Design a protein with these regions (language model features):
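Single conserved hydrophobic/aromatic residue that forms the stacking wall/gate
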Residues: 1-12
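Structural signal for well-ordered, non-membrane alpha-helices
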Residues: 20-27, 87, 198-201
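Generic structural signal for well-ordered, non-membrane alpha-helical segments
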Residues: 16-19, 50, 79, 163, ...
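Glycine-rich phosphate/ribose-binding loops and adjacent secondary-structure elements
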Residues: 29-38, 42-153
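Glycine-rich tight-turn/loop motif centered on a GG-T
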Residues: 10-17, 70-76
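Acidic, His- and aromatic-enriched active-site or binding-groove loops in soluble protein domains
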Residues: 14-25, 59-66
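Glycine- and acidic
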Residues: 10, 64-71, 179-182
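C-terminal extensions of enzymes
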Residues: 154-226
Length: 226
């Protein structure tokens, strides 16, 4: 059960309890050692329910813990508030997985709040719509300004797309509805997020995650950190 909007607390409590009942049945049925089972913390946007769900869910966690029901249209500040509630409760020796999150800012803010893993259709979905994520922000490739731009999507990227194709050629593919456009932009966008998480790991190891966050927001979103 993905809990999507604010409302009466008892309604969401029943939904959370239904999820916990399913988790118990799933754990009892799960017998494949080669398959990982990540129990999912729910609770809508109520701190009390999130805490209750976490405390009931964590005992089932053997290899990792997931957080669901966030990034479903709520303000970013509300998602961050729920992650702040959960951060002290996670097991320290297991990865934490935030479901359905794929924008660079959500990834960075999630890491700052104890998250290790993310998944999302975003990089391939926006690729199908002709949009690329770059070190200087989003590039809408179909725009006319790229008609005679023979530079790569991102001067700082070493992916197959950036090494071999220009913005002008990619724009041609997008505007002709060629499937290669979605393929090449997907390669680039996935590589961009892999490089982002690699850079985050390096910043953590060098104890400069705050500085990295500030610089990334300035370059990608053309704004400072709120």
């Amino acid at each position: 059960d993905r809990l999507r909007s604010r409302g009466l607390g008892d309604v969401y409590k029943r939904q959370m309890e239904r999820t916990l009942n399913w988790l118990d049945r799933c754990a009892k049925a799960h017998g494949r050692e080669e398959q990982m089972l990540f129990p999912i913390i729910q609770g809508n946007f109520f701190a009390r329910l999130r805490e209750e769900s976490a405390k009931a869910t964590i005992p089932y966690a053997k290899c990792g813990i997931a957080v669901g029901g966030l990034s479903v249209g709520e303000p970013a500040s509300l998602m961050y508030e729920m992650l702040d509630v959960l951060q002290p409760l996670y097991p320290e020796n297991m990865p934490r997985y935030l479901m359905g999150v794929g924008t660079p800012d959500y990834i960075i803010e999630g890491v700052l709040r104890g998250i290790d893993m993310f998944d999302c259709v975003l990089p391939t979905r926006i690729a199908r719509n002709g949009t690329a994520m770059t070190s200087k922000g989003k590039v809408v490739v179909r725009n006319a300004c790229y008609k005679e731009d023979f530079s790569p999507l991102d001067e700082n990227c070493d992916c197959y797309c950036c090494k071999n194709f220009s913005k002008a050629y990619l724009r041609h593919l997008v505007n002709c509805n060629e499937i290669e456009a979605a393929m090449l932009l997907s390669i680039h966008n996935v590589n961009f997020l892999l490089k982002l998480t690699e850079n985050i790991r390096t910043a953590i190891a060098e104890d400069r995650l705050g500085e990295f966050r500030e610089n990334f927001y300035r370059d990608y979103y053309n704004k400072g950190v709120n």
